[in-house]
Amino acid sequence: MDQPHALLVASPGLGHLIPILELGNRLSSVLNIHVTILAVTSGSSSPTETEAIHAAAARTICQITEIPSVDVDNLVEPDATIFTKMVVKMRAMKPAVRDAVKLMKRKPTVMIVDFLGTELMSVADDVGMTAKYVYVPTHAWFLAVMVYLPVLDTVVEGEYVDIKEPLKIPGCKPVGPKELMETMLDRSGQQYKECVRAGLEVPMSDGVLVNTWEELQGNTLAALREDEELSRVMKVPVYPIGPIVRTNQHVDKPNSIFEWLDEQRERSVVFVCLGSGGTLTFEQTVELALGLELSGQRFVWVLRRPASYLGAISSDDEQVSASLPEGFLDRTRGVGIVVTQWAPQVEILSHRSIGGFLSHCGWSSALESLTKGVPIIAWPLYAEQWMNATLLTEEIGVAVRTSELPSERVIGREEVASLVRKIMAEEDEEGQKIRAKAEEVRVSSERAWSKDGSSYNSLFEWAKRCYLVP
């Protein structure tokens, strides 16, 4: 009898590729099924993207096939957002994905797409697959907002940002103006319309896999299943199978970061990393540096060249270091280290000396921190990170955050220092509660994936439903 075969399709960009790769690894290793990942590349021949795919192929038990994306410049407005371009790319990839599936010797029976690829679900019907699912690599609150967005679109007048009251999501935490995703800020824009369309298409799947777990978001998951209004919109089963995060990779060669961390006290270092797209303005970089210095805490800072906050530009050491305050590196020598190249985030967060994480709050990064019991200083920059920061601080209680969004004003050095001390200083009462909660979440994350844990059982419930396991 042939081994069951699942097909996963990853949208362009590392932020979408990595969660799909990790999901594929989990499905293959836990369920003992064959997994093929179609990785739609960005089309920019990015060395980082290519390296990530090749590295993943080397360590994964999944089969990975790259599909170059098509040029869609003639299909979008000149000022189209990155989100819009990616959605249009995925729409245009339908023939290529269909052809790739038809060429497979071992036919997949189940297709899984991400939120950007919901239009590809029709391919599953075209080629005779038995089931099609959507994977949401972020949390249940995000899923609830997305599937309820078409309802909001019909009942709310005007721009959401102009409404003083938070948007009500049945059975869930309301969404305030400061939590709105960028895609929701302009209702006349194409990216908003694409979000509404996807919100309608998600319930047309056979179910949704979401990267959270019952103990973390039980109330929101219950609302998706049981709330009279929200469950009527959701329509299909929701399977919480998280946390699914990158696992530790052994660092073979000597690494100055870990040599330095080995010399530090347990839980005494704050790790600062704002993600692959986390570049700051020059002024904000200076204030963050001086705030770290003022805090008196030890730090590891992964720093990128200042740009607009959506810059995502890396550069060489000299250019990055030139953006720091004069004398900063000399004054903090021995207290902190500044890293200007890629750094192994999961391995750093796993180190015993790390006691806090100043993060952009991408959900993958947040989970990497929470599964290690490391509390977070929330520094949201874009996309759904504003929602994530609120969830981490107000709902889960494992983070502190800036008084205003960093995208709206420069966060001063005094506030930076205060936030760092709150998480790192042993005597801070609020920090003690946050650290205790972070440890509680770490334990619950391990429990969720233990045998007969909530996520373990949820995955097997899904696999049985689509005949991937007996």
From Swiss-Prot:
GO MF annotation, one: UDP-glycosyltransferase activity
Gene3D superfamilies: Glycogen Phosphorylase B (3.40.50.2000)
CDD domains for the chain: GT1_Gtf-like (cd03784)
Protein origin, superkingdom: Eukaryota
Residues annotated as binding UDP-alpha-D-glucose: 276, 343-345, 360-368, 382-385
Entry EC no(s): 2.4.1.-
Keywords: Glycosyltransferase, Transferase
Family from the record: Belongs to the UDP-glycosyltransferase family.
Classification via PANTHER family: GLYCOSYLTRANSFERASE-RELATED, UDP-GLYCOSYLTRANSFERASE 72E1
Protein name: UDP-glycosyltransferase 72D1
Protein species of origin: Arabidopsis thaliana (Mouse-ear cress)
